[in-house]
Regions:
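Ser/Thr-rich, low-complexity intrinsically disordered terminal regions
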Residues: 1-117
């Protein structure tokens, strides 16, 4: 469970194989699959809104790209009145990276099939 003042948040970085363009497309697909409305900032990062759920307020989700295939995801509670997030920010990040792994694995499998045929 994250605690933060004024806003609780959770972030994590993971490294993936693929070009910058491929990873950008994978992240876009992951956000769309999750149903999180997003906008692209400066052509190199995403900012999404995680829908409100039971016992959960609005969360802002950001994705940034770094050299070497590193993707950083951050989920942050949008209201300063919320001091504890009950693990929601970490679950948002985990859910996002699970989709990224699924999509990137599928893309890698499809690429290897097209090369062998």
């Amino acid at each position: 469970m994250a605690f933060g003042f004024p806003y609780p948040k959770y972030s994590q970085r993971r490294t993936f194989n693929g070009s910058a363009d491929e990873l950008f497309a994978v992240v876009r697909s992951a956000l769309e699959d999750l149903g999180w409305r997003y906008k692209v900032l400066w052509g190199k990062e995403f900012e999404a809104e995680v829908p409100t759920a039971h016992w959960s307020w609005h969360h802002v989700f950001k994705v940034r790209f770094f050299a070497g295939g590193v993707i950083e995801a951050e989920s942050k509670s949008a209201y300063s009145e919320i001091l504890f997030d009950l693990g929601r920010n970490r679950r948002n990040v985990d859910k996002f990276f699970a989709r990224v792994v699924d999509i990137s694995t599928t893309h890698a499998r499809d690429r290897s099939r097209s090369v062998t045929h």
